[in-house]
Amino acid sequence: MTTGAPPFSGSSPQTTRPQTVAEKILSQRGSAAVYAGDLAVVEVDQVMVVDSIAQSFIERMERDLGAVPKYPERVSIVVDHVAPASTVSVAQAQKEAREYAAKTGVRLFDVGRGICHQVLMEEKLAQPGWIVLGSDSHSTTYGAVAAFGSGMGATDIALAAASGKTWLRVPESVKVTLTGDLRPGVTAKDVALEMIRVLGADGATYQSVEIHAGDRFTRGERMTLANLCVEAGAKAGLVVPGGEILTDYGYDVPAWVYPDEGAAYAREVEIDLSALHPRMSAPSEVDNVHDVAELRGLKVDQVFIGTCTNGRIEDLHAAAEVLRGRRVDPTTRLLVIPASSQVMEEALQDGTLLTLQRAGAVLGTPGCGPCMGRHQGVLAPGEVCVSTSNRNFIGRMGDKDAHIYLASPAVAAATAVMGRVALPEDVAQVAASA
């Protein structure tokens, strides 16, 4: 099945002043040049529906609109949020999603294929310059490849599927410039958390966060950066292509997708990467960010490595590097859930999963796992969890009295070994003194 995305016109709409990346994409996918504050009607290249909203989506399509997807090849249903099904009602909803996909010809990525954003990226269903709408708030992830990715509810998603288009107000853009080089042990997750700290939890509400990273970071690391943008309230998170980063993965990067010099930004911030240390978000807001060293020693009941933020192969490699030849602390549980079946297969083939399992990790089916607190490792009252996920709100992963700390895979793995918040060097020091 082809992507079915409408071809680019080959020439950009006539503009009157410099544009940001968001303005360029929305102009290219619309009928005229648009700028922040304008209303735009645009072509949608891919619509993504997750299992937890599939029933509502189907109801909107069939009962409210009396419609079928205009372009079935541009619609994907992903069973990932509660997969495998945890209750009869969840199983019924997933059954209806499968039946709908078979009836209408839309793509179906069923139980075990993985998390929606990881799967669509692997399937190349997000491309530079595209508009990708998802029924999941972390659809900003597609900005890793300079696609305008944004989360919407069932009604807007259904309208986009039925018509092939959507309308929206063109967002203002916030320019985030990354300078310097990362210290050893500092990762893209630390950069993302620092970015949210600087912007604030609502500091980019209905804005496009445009990240200027040069040729730094892999595609997976760029996914982490774009993924977290919604935690500042962003409508989209766009990482400007740099060097050969995207072409190395086989993407065709159109020349027009880069921002113009002199484009107007609502706000500009600069982050010096060389000044960063490993970071951790403490309860119960993502922008409550501290150096890990400040929280070192906090007792932890559960560690979770996975999600659309940090469940990729490089994340599992980072965790395995810390855990190799060691054991998880007996008072701490370690859950590891690969972001997709492709990640799981690669981790099986190179021995990563064996390393994790021998260390005492509990391995789960590719998918969202306990991230949203519905199955596969929810937290009891008073429990403390260090997670590589993207949200630490009250009640997010289980009981409202549980406490969630967000960190990188390496810090999460070190914490699992020590049973307390720790850095990888803490694990190495203990081993050296043994």
UniProtKB/Swiss-Prot annotation:
Pfam families assigned: Aconitase
Protein's pathway: Amino-acid biosynthesis; L-leucine biosynthesis; L-leucine from 3-methyl-2-oxobutanoate: step 2/4
Cofactor comment text: Binds 1 [4Fe-4S] cluster per subunit.
EC number, UniProt record: 4.2.1.33
GO molecular function: 3-isopropylmalate dehydratase activity; 4 iron, 4 sulfur cluster binding; metal ion binding
Top-rank lineage group of the source organism: Bacteria
Cofactor(s) demanded: [4Fe-4S] cluster
Top EC class of this enzyme: lyase
Known catalytic reactions: (2R,3S)-3-isopropylmalate = (2S)-2-isopropylmalate
Binding sites annotated in the UniProt record for [4Fe-4S] cluster: C308, C368, C371
GO BP term, example: L-leucine biosynthetic process
InterPro entries associated with the record: Acnase/IPM_dHydase_lsu_aba_1/3 (IPR015931), Acoase/IPM_deHydtase_lsu_aba (IPR001030), Aconitase_4Fe-4S_BS (IPR018136), Aconitase_4Fe-4S_dom (IPR036008), HAcnase/IPMdehydase_lsu_prok (IPR011826), Homoacnase/IPMdehydase_lsu (IPR006251), IPM_dehydratase_rel_enz (IPR050067)
Keyword Iron: yes
Keywords of the record: 4Fe-4S, Amino-acid biosynthesis, Branched-chain amino acid biosynthesis, Iron, Iron-sulfur, Leucine biosynthesis, Lyase, Metal-binding
Function comment: Catalyzes the isomerization between 2-isopropylmalate and 3-isopropylmalate, via the formation of 2-isopropylmaleate.
Subunit structure: Heterodimer of LeuC and LeuD.
Family named by the database record: Belongs to the aconitase/IPM isomerase family. LeuC type 2 subfamily.
Protein name per UniProt: 3-isopropylmalate dehydratase large subunit 1
Species this chain originates from: Deinococcus radiodurans (strain ATCC 13939 / DSM 20539 / JCM 16871 / CCUG 27074 / LMG 4051 / NBRC 15346 / NCIMB 9279 / VKM B-1422 / R1)
Gene behind this protein: leuC1
